[in-house]
Each structure stands twice: as C-alpha cells, then as structure tokens.
C-alpha cells in the first residue's frame, strides 16, 4: 500500500488515502477483479443461504453442545477443546458474547495417538473426511495423518497440533446418527493396527 501501484498509474494508496488506504485498496481491487455487482446467480445463492442461516446455526450449536458433552465423557477421548467445554479458558467470555451458542468447531484428542486418529477417520461413514468447515454435513479430519502429515514433531507442535488431535465441524444431522457413526470410529481406533481396515 505504501509502494506505487502500477495497476493504478503509480498511485500510492497510503499517500493518497491515509488511514483509509486499506479500505480503498480492497475496494479498488475488488471492483477490478470481480466487477461492481454480483452475478444474478451468485446473488440468489447468497440470499438463499442467508434466509435459513439462523435456523442452521441453531442446529449446529445445539449439536455441538451435545457433542462436547458426549466427547468429554467418552473413554476414548483424552481432551476436548470448544468454548463451551468445562475448563476452557474462554468459556465465560464466550457465554457472555455468544449467548446463543459458540459455534460447531470442536477439536479433541483421541487416545492412542496418530494410529488411532487415522483409524477413527477411516472408519466413520456419516462424517465426511474433509478439510473445510461449516458445512451442513459433519466433517472430520486428523491433521497429523492428512493435511499436516509432512510436518516433523517440532513443526506440528509449533502449529498447535498434536498426533491425537481430530478437528470436527458438527453438521445438521440427527445427533444420535453422529454419535453412532463416532462409536464405529472409536471401536476401530481401539483395535490393534494390524486388524484395522484402512
């Protein structure tokens, strides 16, 4: 923003717009790259999604609260991280600023480490093994055996990850269906590695 921008005849956004430089640059580049208005289909998709957002978030948050309780009491789970979880450092703040729910993202540690995490992921069927979040479907990923599998121990730790961590984005399915699916995954994670179908 402080250097002359060739795409705008050498304009320096910082010099020209001062404190609003970032806003002006984002606006100018957005207009250049995407045009001044949405395509009709894109506008319809956004509107269609917004109309049911509050209902979907209610279900996401409800399922997440139940999931935190389920995981917190499960013998195969070492730890649970979610703003509603007992002992979470931000629990009080989250309840104050997010009274209707703290979202559907949960991280938990599976007992048995990397092998158990991989076995769990490969044996759930309802939950999708995907790296994205916020879907209508329940999504799970074991970063140590998937997205971050090339990292050594020190780099994993620096990234805030552990071999036992599973990231969960709770979906809109019936809660009992999610639990039944997770029970299949937990059973597989307890088997000796040679007996696990991966």
Report residues per predicted region:
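Active-site C-terminal subdomain of aminotransferase-like
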Residues: 1-105, 109-137
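Short glycine-enriched loop/turn motifs at secondary-structure junctions
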Residues: 100-102, 161-164
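Flexible, small-/acidic-enriched active-site or ligand-binding loops
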Residues: 128-161
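Pyridoxal 5′-phosphate
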Residues: 168
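Short, amphipathic alpha-helical "lid/cap" segments that border enzyme active or binding sites
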Residues: 175-179
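C-terminal alpha-helix
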Residues: 181, 185-189
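Structural/interface elements that position substrates and couple domains in central-metabolism enzymes
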Residues: 191-193
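Conserved small/polar residues in nucleotide/adenosyl-binding loops
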Residues: 196-198
């Amino acid at each position: 923003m402080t250097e002359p921008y060739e795409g705008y005849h050498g304009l320096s956004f910082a010099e020209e717009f001062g404190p609003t430089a970032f806003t002006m640059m984002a606006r100018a580049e957005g207009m250049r790259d995407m045009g001044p208005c949405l395509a009709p289909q894109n506008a319809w998709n956004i509107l269609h999604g917004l109309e049911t957002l509050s209902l979907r978030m209610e279900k996401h948050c409800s399922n997440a609260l139940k999931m935190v309780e389920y995981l917190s009491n499960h013998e195969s789970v070492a730890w649970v991280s979610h703003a509603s979880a007992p002992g979470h450092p931000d629990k009080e703040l989250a309840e104050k600023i997010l009274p209707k729910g703290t979202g559907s993202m949960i991280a938990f540690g599976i007992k048995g480490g990397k092998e158990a995490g991989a076995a769990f992921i490969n044996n759930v069927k309802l939950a999708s093994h995907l790296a994205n979040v916020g879907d209508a479907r329940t999504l799970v990923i074991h970063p140590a055996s998937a997205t971050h599998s090339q990292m050594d121990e020190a780099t994993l730790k620096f990234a805030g990850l552990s071999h036992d961590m599973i990231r969960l984005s709770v979906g809109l399915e019936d809660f009992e269906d999610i639990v039944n699916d997770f029970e299949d995954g937990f059973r597989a994670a307890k088997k000796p590695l040679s007996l696990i179908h991966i």
